[in-house]
């Protein structure tokens, strides 16, 4: 499970860095915190839903960077 956590943290940092290059630093910081909160919510919800199955929970947590990237660009392109 620690490997999933490390890879998830790397994904969130990389997505935030990409958003920072494309939009600006404020967007990168806000998307970082949004993805961390989303990953925590997904973790607790899927742990409750699957009865503690960590593999399924770890796989579902990778929705956080993908959703964070999509949401950030939808909001970001609306401002330009």
UniProtKB/Swiss-Prot annotation:
Chain ranges passing through the membrane: 2-22, 32-52, 55-75
Principal place of residence: membrane
Topology relative to the membrane: Multi-pass membrane protein
Disulfide bonds: none
Keyword set, alphabetical order: Cell membrane, Membrane, Transmembrane, Transmembrane helix
Gene Ontology cellular component annotations, sorted alphabetically: plasma membrane
Highest taxon of source: Bacteria
InterPro entries with a match to the protein in the record: DUF2545
Cellular localization per UniProt: Cell membrane
Protein name (database record): Uncharacterized protein YfdY
The species this protein was found in: Escherichia coli (strain K12)
């Amino acid at each position: 499970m620690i490997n999933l956590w490390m890879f998830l943290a790397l994904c969130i940092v990389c997505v935030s860095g990409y958003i920072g290059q494309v939009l600006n630093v404020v967007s990168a910081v806000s998307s970082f915190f949004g993805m961390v909160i989303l990953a925590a919510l997904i973790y607790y919800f899927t742990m409750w839903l699957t009865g503690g199955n960590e593999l399924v929970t770890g796989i579902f947590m990778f929705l956080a960077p993908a959703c964070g990237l999509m949401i950030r660009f939808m909001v970001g392109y609306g401002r330009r």
